[in-house]
Amino acid sequence: PSDHAEVSVNDMRVPHSAVVGRIGHGLDVAQNFVHQNRIRQAAQSVGVARYCVQESVKYARARKTFGRPIAQHQAIQFPIAEMHAEVEMLRSYVFKVANELDRKPAESVSDQVAIANFRANRLACNAADLAMQVHGGIGYTRGKPFEHIYRHFRRYRITEGSDEVQIRKIAAYLFGYAGPGKQPAAKKDTGA
């Protein structure tokens, strides 16, 4: 659960020693924090997706139907193997982006942070959903962590910028509306 508060201040004096960054540029400071938080969310999401895969493999090896472990069925193997591949690819990408964020100005890697955040948060939800499916009825109960993981990580697709906000950021960089490759605005044809 998250708390939401509304704060309002009037005629407040802030001593110079308490000012963070340049006056009038508070959004820059906040955006830097947002980028840091988004990459942390991405790392957490990849970690939990990895956990869901590992627990699914463990359960599939142990759970037997008709005398055979369900891990012997391709209908169980293939989705888990696909999820594992996605987790490992995204894990490498999140490490790469986190490294870039440590070395470069946040705005120069903002699109990469958005990609990592968007894909990792979706991956966590998909991995939790798969784990519930593999575990069957017990996977949906509170006796296993997957329903909680799904609920917790589903909110990451809303907080720190919704999926749509992340996609918009990616598109803005991709099409030259933002970032280092930003194209100058086209001049309007006045017909003269």
Predicted regions and their residues:
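Alpha-helical interface subdomain recognition
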Residues: 6-12, 16, 23-192
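FAD-binding subdomain of flavoenzyme oxidoreductases
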Residues: 1-5
